């Protein structure tokens, strides 16, 4: 008579199934986080050869709207002068003078930004032109233009943040030293907050034609904007916004499909290049990161 082990009656298969079930449940809870991290690692590996060129591309796209605006004014000089003189009431030769100043500041400032020369003066001149044109063309009260200009200014803030080096300046004895790194941090925070104004403008503009696809895109956009503002997985969600905005820009603002004689062609072209500037700001954010005031940086500390 053979003896039976007291453990032989334990249903091993049930224990294995139960263990596998518990293990599977544990894995499912981490699936999204693990997949997101894996996707980001793969994306960084894929983009590694292009990373050195990202800052240059970002700066060029940020100022693309200024290049386009300057070229448009030059190629349409008689029409622009006539509009400013007859409709905006710029008399006594001030109309061509105003346009000339805008063209020079936009071309010189944009070129300096692209090549990282005299950044403070270049960004200051572009900010001045942005405000000057808003008043001159009577767009200061336009809600849509306000959101767009804020987004473009956000991109310029990110470029400005890159000009501050890590050093401390003590101008007055007995007072705390001023950290250039802190200035850079504040500009990075302001830049990424202002960048999302573009999406707020789009959401406010699209009040009709509700569909499930549009609702899903809006939810994804709002979520990504919130993550960029607080700085949680900011690079990943900024890349998501780049994808959404790029696709929407080529679909909505396809000025090349509008006849040349149509008056709407210039409006579509202006919107297209201004949206490209915001895409450039987001690309710059993808490259530089959210900065010190962000959840991502706090996680590194704690």
Curated annotation (Swiss-Prot):
Asked if Nucleotide-binding is a keyword of the record, the answer is no
Please indicate which superkingdom the organism of origin belongs to: Eukaryota
* Locus of motif Di-lysine motif: 299-302
Q: Where are the transmembrane segments?
A: 95-115, 120-140, 193-213, 215-235, 236-256, 271-291
Membrane-protein topology: Multi-pass membrane protein
- Family membership, please give it: Belongs to the SURF4 family.
- What's the protein name? Surfeit locus protein 4 homolog
Q: Which organism is it from?
A: Schizosaccharomyces pombe (strain 972 / ATCC 24843) (Fission yeast)
Lineage of origin = Eukaryota, Fungi, Dikarya, Ascomycota, Taphrinomycotina
